Curated annotation (Swiss-Prot):
This is Chorismate pyruvate-lyase. Substrate binds at M36, R78, L116, E157. Monomer. Transmembrane segments: none annotated.
Length: 174
């Protein structure tokens, strides 16, 4: 697990969903409304997650993410690397206001190596407010404001070069 203040995610340049440089095959992945974990499972034998950082942080540590979440005394931060057949496919960062962590959803702080999608999409209490698309150098990224039983959480995903998102497109990152 990572100790310290640095995120595993480098800065991301966010753009409009209708960005003219967004190829249709990339948009199909980035605008996925279902579980990205399930989608990845269609392209490998085994998906697993390795947590890099799990801790409570203050609003000051959110940076521009604070614009997307309500004011809270603390936020649960989870940063992970998701692997498909032991190859890193995705960096994930989840920020959850403490108020979202009530009742059974308190389990979000104890996911460990369980992919977030397996928890979120196991019931019918999940909705998505929006998906923002962005770039981190040559890599595609997306950010979603999700609501679990009406309570918000912010999920940012960066698709690494070996990700199947790039398999059938002309913009494979170097």
């Amino acid at each position: 697990m990572f100790i310290g203040d640095a995120s595993i995610l480098k800065p991301i340049q966010w753009c409009a969903t209708e960005h003219p440089e967004l190829p249709a095959d990339i948009a199909d992945w980035l605008m996925e409304l279902g579980s990205m974990t399930r989608r990845f499972e269609q392209h490998c034998q085994r998906v697993h997650v390795e947590p890099q950082r799990e801790c409570f942080i203050t609003r000051d540590a959110l940076g521009e993410e604070a614009e997307h979440l309500p004011v809270s005394q603390r936020y649960w931060l989870r940063e992970i690397v998701l692997f498909g057949d032991n190859v890193p496919w995705l960096l994930g960062r989840t920020v959850i206001p403490e108020e979202t962590l009530s009742g059974p959803d308190r389990a979000l702080v104890d996911l460990g190596t369980l992919p977030l999608g397996r928890y979120l999409f196991s019931g019918d209490a999940l909705t998505r407010d929006y998906i923002h698309v962005g770039r981190q150098d040559n890599l595609w990224a997306r950010r979603s404001l999700l609501r679990l039983s009406g309570n918000p959480l912010l999920l940012t995903e960066v698709f690494l070069p070996a990700s199947p998102l790039y398999t059938h497109c002309d913009s494979i990152p170097k």
